[in-house]
Amino acid sequence: MTAVSGDQTTSGSYDVRALQEKWQARWAKENPFTASEDPADPRPRRYVLDMFPYPSGDLHMGHAEAFAIGDVIARYHFARGENVLHPIGWDSFGLPAENAAIKHNFHPAEWTYTNIETQAESFRRYAISLDWSRRLHTSDPEYYRWNQWFFLRFFERGLAYRKDGLVNWCPKDQTVLANEQVIQGKCERCGTEVERRALNQWYFKITDYAQRLLDDMEQLEGKWPERVLTMQRNWIGRSEGADVQFTIEGREEPVTVFTTRPDTLYGATFFVVAPDSPLADELCAPEQREAFEAYRTQVSKLSDIERQSTEREKTGVFLGRYAINPVNGERIPVWAADYVLADYGHGAIMAVPAHDQRDLDFARKFNLPVRVVVDTGEPDPAETGIATPGEGTLINSGPLNGLSKSEAIPRIIEILTERGTGKAAVNYRLRDWLVSRQRFWGTPIPIIHCPECGEVPVPDEELPVRLPDLRGAALAPKGVSPLAAATDWVNVSCPRCGGPAKRDTDTMDTFVDSSWYFLRYCSPNLDTAPFDQEKVAKWGPIDQYVGGVEHAILHLLYSRFFTKVLYDMGMVPFTEPFVRLLNQGQVINQGKAMSKSLGNGVDLGQEIDRYGVDAVRLTMVFAGPPEEDIDWADVSPGASVKFLNRAYRVMAEAAAASAPGVDPATGDLALRRMTHQTLAKVTEAVEAQRFNVAIARIMELVTAARRAIDSGPGAADPAVREAAEVIAITLGLFAPYVAEEGWEMLGHTGSVSVGTWREPDPALLVQESVTCVVQVASKVRDKLQVSPDISAEELERLALASEKVQNHIAGREIRRIVVREPKLVNIVVA
């Protein structure tokens, strides 16, 4: 059998659709997955969370995989009798809804909430064990009110601020993007080439937490995927070195540069500033102004990725000024060059071409001097064009001559400190989180701009600042927020002086919404605070978080930052939000990501109609380790259907042939051993998140039970009933519909997924014998049944005593005997 046909599977084993409808109705009525807040409830608490979906349409294959995996984990803890919080909500602000509203002339809420209801119905059909009483939507005023409340608390603490600066601008979506939302120079949402613009924007000061974000990763080691931790470490980008002050001729204040190689300071032969920085504009001499302006215009068309590419020919312009090297007094030219970025370090660098390839490429292009100050034993970079950044002995460096790098760095920092021209410093690649957006469908920033009072927070009692009713063409991007055109909404009285003022017309990055939603689930209907701190202390932090690796830097980093701020505010008792993280792979098709352009998309609804929910879920989880991609062209939902029918028949026949309550100890011992070993192995595999291995063990038990029914003690044997019950319990993690039906057929009430897990009998886990393979010249000649505790000496003796083995070694010289007790003996002969 390969598919669901009409109302029944083609084998006629059970009516898949009727069974799904029956149990959906039962779960909706009984709500078996609602978490208890009863303080007297003795059950251990467990918080399992899937990254909440964006309502862009119905659920797709990626949702199906992620939520199937998360549901296995949640159902396992439900089955173990724990008090599990497994909630659902929607990340419902964002550009897709706004773009749809512009295209079809309606309000974004119409599209958003219609899609939410579609997805909610699909979640119910897909049998996810959710606590529906805690459902939330981030686009509800009752939710985004607290985004605004947090913004004001951040503002009070100096963590929310506004500044002028160069920002990433998406010309298609007409809004700014955080650095994390620019992927290889393009908008991560629409793929448009990103531009750089000078704008006044709101930021969250995540850089204040850079070191703590790094240090606290120790809590996550071994519990988060190492690649996610590596990605975050690289994004934060801690560098140790020195801040060095260069005097600029004609400028009173020195310019500070950060370098990780202060030991090479004697090799600095020119000075480079970012062409789009205010410093470059200031330093440009009048006679170079025209050339500089032309160059700056040229650079403005390049993305940061292009500017830092090692493949591009270096470009730049001399600014007509000179800097003074603080260690040797040398006069070095000041250039503007696109490979230096305004927002890294101080927007300026000392160029040491002998030991940095980008500096060397630039020096060779513009005939600037190259001075070797570290003897690495390699050829002169000025001749080869290959810089030598490695270790060596300092030369041409005055008091540093003869020192190694590790000796020279602290010495030069000491010299700079004594002279007042430098100091040890730490720099981070991480930049503050740009949180303002020039779009409508998001949380309004709760600030009022008063010509007399400046930036004035909206009073807490006036929150939420609700979005005005704009729709269709009024939402079209114009380079400023659509809210700016809502004059009745914009024009207000200043809360401080009462004079005329204007609301801030930007909305918040929707990653603000998802940076704390997991806390709101603990008390989703609370209207006096963002969350009940006592309940958060009981439920948090989240024990298991499940979602895609694409969120490694954005959502996960921001959530970690938010949690640390809330910890400092005394609102949560933990500093990390997610104890364990599982990143599932992608569902691809024919070796490629699914896309309309490739025509390789797979419709989840059609797959469910064809095979049934249980088969689709089982296939998703059985395809391989959860972190690996699933190629839907390579898996077989039809095979899952066949297996589920075999499991169903075992449960049905055991239920029909035997009565509950009979002591299974009176049943077939071999099957009982298999049943309890399966329990132990499934438990171990699920806890290790090797879900495909757990399913394989269940399949083996179904086969053993089938064999016992057909050619063993028969379906009436108590051991068969015990096996059938364990099949129902363990299969309930992966295929809840057929498992619930089997559990009920076997005479049980209540959900198979709640409090039913069994502990294996240790006595039945002890193997009385194992099979030992005996090889002669690497060919199998006999198989022996031996004790699992047999010694190597005894096993060798038994192997040599075997008549079959004797027939193959008679008259031959035995070179050596390899024993791997208790399962292998290999006799090597001449």
From Swiss-Prot:
EC code: 6.1.1.4
Keywords for this protein: Aminoacyl-tRNA synthetase, ATP-binding, Cytoplasm, Ligase, Nucleotide-binding, Protein biosynthesis
Motif 'KMSKS' region: positions: 593-597
Catalytic reactions on record: tRNA(Leu) + L-leucine + ATP = L-leucyl-tRNA(Leu) + AMP + diphosphate
Sample GO molecular function, one term: aminoacyl-tRNA deacylase activity
Gene Ontology annotations of biological process type: leucyl-tRNA aminoacylation
Signal sequence annotation: none
Protein name: Leucine--tRNA ligase
PROSITE patterns per the UniProt record, alphabetical: AA_TRNA_LIGASE_I
UniProt record similarity statement: Belongs to the class-I aminoacyl-tRNA synthetase family.
Residue sites binding ATP per the record: 596
Gene name as annotated: leuS
Location of this chain's protein in the cell: Cytoplasm
UniProt xrefs under CDD domains: Anticodon_Ia_Leu_BEm, LeuRS_core
Annotated region (Disordered), positions in chain: 379-399
Entries under InterPro entries matching the protein: aa-tRNA-synth_I_CS (IPR001412), aa-tRNA-synth_Ia (IPR002300), Leu-tRNA-ligase (IPR002302), Leu_tRNA-synth_edit (IPR025709), M/V/L/I-tRNA-synth_anticd-bd (IPR013155), Methionyl/Leucyl_tRNA_Synth (IPR015413), Rossmann-like_a/b/a_fold (IPR014729), tRNAsynth_Ia_anticodon-bd (IPR009080)
Keyword Protein biosynthesis: yes
Assigned GO CC terms: cytosol
Record bears the keyword Cytoplasm: yes
Phylogenetic classification of the source organism: Bacteria, Bacillati, Actinomycetota, Actinomycetes, Streptosporangiales
Highest taxon above the source species: Bacteria
Motif ('HIGH' region): 53-63
